[in-house]
Design a protein with these regions (language model features):
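Ferredoxin-like alpha/beta domains used as RNA- or RNAP-binding modules
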Residues: 1-5, 12, 22-82
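Short, charged beta-turn/beta-strand-edge "cap" motif at the junction between a beta-strand
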Residues: 14-17
Length: 82
């Protein structure tokens, strides 16, 4: 499995279907994602790998805050063609 940490993904299932999220950490079959608004960094969402579609964009999660995360996702979704 490739490293997904820091990668922007699009949700393909669930209430957040169609939204962009950032993978904070991953294990063998799940990813833990946040978007800074609905899912803050303090309470990550656990999603199955089959319910997310990875993009080619990777961000640095080292000094990430909820505000920075919201801004990055908004810029990405405005510039993407999904």
């Amino acid at each position: 499995m490739e490293s997904l940490s820091g990668r922007i993904v699009r949700s393909c299932a669930g209430r957040d279907k169609g939204n962009f999220l950032v993978v904070i950490r991953a294990d063998e079959s799940f990813v833990y994602v946040a978007d800074g608004k609905e899912r803050k960094l303090a309470s990550l969402k656990k999603k199955s790998l089959k319910h997310v579609k990875p993009t080619n964009t990777v961000i640095d999660t080292e000094s990430l805050t909820d505000k920075k995360l919201r801004k990055l996702i908004a810029e990405f979704s405005a510039a993407s063609d999904f």
